[in-house]
Amino acid sequence: MLEKLIKNFATYMGITSTLELDADGAYVLPISEVVKVRAQQNADNEIVLSASLGALPPSADTAKLYLQMMIGNLFGRETGGSALGLDSEGNVVMVRRFSGDTTYDDFVRHVESFMNFSETWLSDLGLGKQ
């Protein structure tokens, strides 16, 4: 199901290159110069979108930024239903899961919303300026 959604989405976005799976089995969607969105299907048949937003700046007040992320995560209101966290290397990541049985129109809405919230958080946390 995901492969068909991805191919239709790539056509919709005007992506002419062939989308292939990365080493983790995820499609990397080249739809933004700033944020690369990965899409894959998990064992529970959910589609998982993820994006690495980068490392916090060395001069950052990490306690303040972690609090900002926690508040943003509360009820998904400031993340569009996604979750912010840190990966094993300390980079800020955003993740969103939804049913793999989604319609194409809903898939497009999920991806576009995820991109918008990812780019907003990238800016709000001062990432990508290093």
UniProtKB/Swiss-Prot annotation:
Matches recorded under InterPro entries: Tir_chaperone
CDD domains assigned to the protein according to its UniProt record, in alphabetical order: T3SC_I-like (cd16364)
Q: Which SUPFAM superfamilies match?
A: Type III secretory system chaperone-like
A GO BP entry is: protein secretion by the type III secretion system
Q: Which Pfam families match?
A: CesT
Q: Which family does it belong to?
A: Belongs to the chlamydial CPn_0713/CT_663/TC_0034 family.
Q: What protein name does the entry list?
A: Protein CPn_0713/CP_0033/CPj0713/CpB0740
Q: Which organism is it from?
A: Chlamydia pneumoniae (Chlamydophila pneumoniae)
